[in-house]
Swiss-Prot record:
It is found in: Host cytoplasm; Host nucleus. This is Protein E7. It comes from Human papillomavirus type ME180. One of its GO terms (molecular function) is DNA binding. The lineage of its organism: Viruses, Monodnaviria, Shotokuvirae, Cossaviricota, Papovaviricetes. Plays a role in viral genome replication by driving entry of quiescent cells into the cell cycle. Stimulation of progression from G1 to S phase allows the virus to efficiently use the cellular DNA replicating machinery to achieve viral genome replication. E7 protein has both transforming and trans-activating activities. Induces the disassembly of the E2F1 transcription factor from RB1, with subsequent transcriptional activation of E2F1-regulated S-phase genes. Interferes with host histone deacetylation mediated by HDAC1 and HDAC2, leading to transcription activation. It comes from the Viruses. InterPro entries: Papilloma_E7 (IPR000148). GO terms for cellular component: host cell cytoplasm; host cell nucleus. Highly phosphorylated.
Length: 110
């Protein structure tokens, strides 16, 4: 390309017909290092780690929930302690029928 703007005459396309399909070597010629460097965990260690994760899922953890008041739409922040399974049940209630009322709207309706 010569000049500030390309023109169709300046564009040169070179097309080569490729009728032959060249074979590709898919064999990996990579060599592995010594297996002494690798740390192989026995199955009981892996199972123990999975057991720890499952136990952690059942323990009570503190979670912060942000929602809005169903009357005035003010932001509410709740802190609950629940297991992951129970927190999931609370999330399902939020999506279904559970509504929260802020303290100001709660005192006005009484």
């Amino acid at each position: 390309m010569h000049g500030p703007k390309p023109t169709v005459q300046e564009i040169v396309l070179e097309l080569c017909p490729c009728n032959e399909i060249e074979p590709v070597d898919l064999v990996c010629h990579e060599q592995l290092g010594d297996s002494d460097d690798e740390i192989d965990e026995p199955d009981h260690a892996v199972n123990h780690h999975q057991h720890q994760l499952l136990a952690r899922r059942d323990e009570q953890q503190r979670h912060t929930i942000q929602c809005t008041c169903c009357k005035c739409n003010n932001l509410l922040q709740l802190v609950v302690e629940a297991s992951r399974e129970n927190l999931r049940n609370v999330e399902l209630l939020f999506m279904d029928s559970l509504n929260f009322v802020c303290p100001w709207c709660a005192t006005e309706t009484q």
